[in-house]
């Protein structure tokens, strides 16, 4: 188990190849700058388990009978990274980064293992919003995080044996609007989606980093950022398809939006929701994007033309009202969509919340919502 001692992060990061199957249906092999995908192992690994005895999953505290539920009894969650046969999930208020591993349907969910922890200000909607692995993670073991501090929102880099290093600072902090997202879209380019800190005027101000999509090249301590998109409201997520397009979700006072950033940096609005279902995390594929919905308690599947990326039909909903309010989303290597719930702060928590869930791949295309 990893520890944090006197502000220094201890990580145990072992790496290996992950064989990824599937193609179009939200397969993270198409949307990741990692080749092959890394895996993350905690310190002091547990001995191999004996094959489970077939039967029903036992009952008890923090044991969810739903076979799709991977982890239970988490604090409210932030970002989520699928790693093939496991995942990393951030706890927004505690600053912990946890590894979660699925088990067979007859076994109780395993207790998540802490991989790292960073100090955050988790008040309001701030804290540890998102995480991303370095594209050279196999060599350097670095994790990037979007966090709220006592003075600002910022991007930091976490390495074994040292304190987090500031990569991008000065993103405005407010009572609300602190959530942000980070995504490596190439091995040397990170996109940073920032909230408006509850101040819509910051989103259109050239002097503010708030309410923007920012580009950071070769992220390192003291990096500067280039503004790619202005006018972001409450930041949802940014997710790339690994080829030529990046999707952005955000919430405004009048509508929730799904925007498309093309390879030439032009931005178009792909879809809007006047009923404001609470767009949050997203997972992209070459022919669409899955969006976690907080208020609507579902995953929206927006099918896009693989050539033009146009969304022409109303996104369909899956897993509606099954797991409560959803935040983070990530693409699994087998076509599944990993999601993390945010019921402890945004919804009505049940006895197993908050949770990480693997949702089976959707069958068919879009439809009415």
Give the residues covered by each predicted segment.
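Sequence/structural signature of beta-propeller domains
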Residues: 2-369
